Amino acid sequence: WLSILIAPGSSLGGARPKANILDTDKSLWIAKFPSKSDTIDKAAWEYLAYELAVNSGIEMSSCRIERIMGNYNTFFTKRFDRENGKRIHFASAMTMTGNNEDTIRDNQPSYLEIAEFISNYGVNIEGNLHQLWRRIIFNIAISNTDDHLRNHGFILTNDGWILSPAYDLNPSIDKDGLSLNIDMDNNELDFDLAKSV
């Protein structure tokens, strides 16, 4: 039955086949399964990125890997938009910055747009800006070039909007720049550029 579950992909979005999984404590997790076309253990790399991120002070939901079937691991991450079976309001940075596929087609979005949303509508502004900058530096360090606006998000708390825990942190060798510009014009994997903003 597991192969039937994995085969069609899912409605959870992203490039990898996924499913919601209930843990023994009734918490909801996302399972990211290996793909038939994988030539490396992507789950193991994502788990390594998770461990490095947490040790770098980046806030993330709990993650783990398990070998379920085949040659590669399955990556599990606890859903941060659920608590005691109830939804916590989450919105992507794509939505909260007022962007969509049409607006980003001709104008590459920037981390400065996320920072502007935090400054104008967020709570714990200094802490959230500091966390965002850590994520920029980390993405440069591991060449996470899949850092687009849908891979950043916000959670609505009783006090207001905060950055969600980081997610989908994966090293990549496919591109030579981030998906988001660091300033308004430049997306280079450059620590000095990040220091300048």
Which ranges hold each PLM region?
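Anionic ligand-binding catalytic core segments
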Residues: 1-149, 153-197
